[in-house]
Amino acid sequence: MKILFCDVLLLSLLSSVFSSCPRDCLTCQEKLHPAPDSFNLKTCILQCEEKVFPRPLWTVCTKVMASGSGQLSPADPELVSAALYQPKASEMQHLKRMPRVRSLVQVRDAEPGADAEPGADAEPGADDAEEVEQKQLQKRFGGFTGARKSARKLANQKRFSEFMRQYLVLSMQSSQRRRTLHQNGNV
């Protein structure tokens, strides 16, 4: 069992060493000299192997590799800085939670070769269904909070009116006692 595990480990290491994507990404990283946090080697390798879409980082690397000089032209730093920014996983999770962004991501994933606006090819019926769903959620949520708010307001009014009634009754009783005591001459 140990021999089999060692063989698999050795083969995986050899395949990663002899593949061109890691070597190309390392070369690209050396030629670009980016900030340590801006260049993600794993992302570059995945983009090279075409497992991740879109591939802005790998596009810049192919241009650098094709130039061969290792120096970028003065117009390229903007392209490099835009390509080196990769959204974090937490940012992507937050974006995917939003329904509109999720639909745009799904459209983009469905048509990887399309450069047109992502929402332009979507079916109009899908947007209508999504809007109806959002309105229903808004109505339900708004109605729920509205009902609680009005119920709370009514309960506060009832509580206050009950308090006022008790206060008035007690004050009337005490004033009657005073009058009675005053009339009897006990005061």
From Swiss-Prot:
PANTHER family cross-referenced by the UniProt entry: PREPRONOCICEPTIN, PROENKEPHALIN
Name this protein carries in UniProt: Prepronociceptin
Disulfide bridges in this chain: none
Family affiliation: Belongs to the opioid neuropeptide precursor family.
Gene Ontology terms for molecular function: opioid peptide activity; receptor ligand activity
InterPro entries: Nociceptin, Opioid_neupept
One record GO biological process: sensory perception of pain
Region described as Disordered: 109-133
Any one annotated GO CC term: synaptic membrane
Signal peptide bounds: 1-19
Post-translational changes noted in the entry: Specific enzymatic cleavages at paired basic residues probably yield other active peptides besides nociceptin. The N-terminal domain contains 6 conserved cysteines thought to be involved in disulfide bonding and/or processing.
Mapped Sequence repeat ranges: 109-114, 115-120, 121-126
Keyword annotations of the record: Cleavage on pair of basic residues, Disulfide bond, Neuropeptide, Neurotransmitter, Opioid peptide, Repeat, Secreted, Signal
